[in-house]
Swiss-Prot record:
SUPFAM superfamilies: S-adenosyl-L-methionine-dependent methyltransferases. Disulfide bonds: none annotated. This is Ribosomal RNA small subunit methyltransferase J. Specifically methylates the guanosine in position 1516 of 16S rRNA. S-adenosyl-L-methionine binds at R111, D112, E127, R128, D180. One of its GO terms (molecular function) is rRNA (guanine-N2-)-methyltransferase activity. Signal peptide: none annotated. It comes from Alkalilimnicola ehrlichii (strain ATCC BAA-1101 / DSM 17681 / MLHE-1). InterPro entries: 16SrRNA_methylTrfase_J, SAM-dependent_MTases_sf.
Amino acid sequence: MINRNHRPLRGVLSDPDEPAAAAALAHRLDLPLLTEPPETPALFLHHSRNGLALRSSGSNAPGPIRVSLDEGRQGQRLRQASLKRETLARACGLRGGRSLRIVDATAGLGRDAMVLAALGARVTLIERHPVIAALLADGLRRARRSHPELAARLHLVEADSLQWLAELTPAERPEVICLDPMYPAGSTRGAVRKDLQALRELPDWPGLAPVDEVALLALARASATARVVVKRPGRAAPLAGKAPDWQLPGRSTRFDVYRGLAGD
């Protein structure tokens, strides 16, 4: 979810409605506590009564980015979710009355994970960037109040996917692992929704090395008992140059499906 066009992350904006929460988050992330938005173009976190949001300052800045089960396109997608409408669900092998254990190893804002949970899957979300993990944690906290049944099927882990998958015991291995890595080099910015561009512009975090996509795909296949599903732009090369066992095309993206090896 991170690219080279970074913008500075200035800190956490204190809010009269949530001053203690803003201060606690700033302390945990080791970021400055702001009393007003940055004057120059930059990113900042804002903790208000509406939840935690990643915001941008400057002209033509997109609106706040937060994790929500009710707002905008995501809310509409969840309300309309069905096995027939969601190509991702079919790629994962979801069927009516069947509850799968799925790991979303590149969770991002958790939008696909929420849809899978709405369709009955139990989903573990793995996110390694502390800022994105904080957005997810806040969204799931609010979801436990507004959508308790759905939220109960979502479990967030702030960790590096390679390390987390490597430590799974045989009994803990999921049926399905989903990967949605950053769009490959050469993809146009137009391929990325405007409300997600700020997320892609987050600066690198200390201690986080670039994702080794070859190792991640190999370990995901070794850890999944049924399949690995990789979300790709429609015309992009397969992840790590590894041809999938089969594909399911969508409008602008496709799902490359690899047979899991842990069930052999």
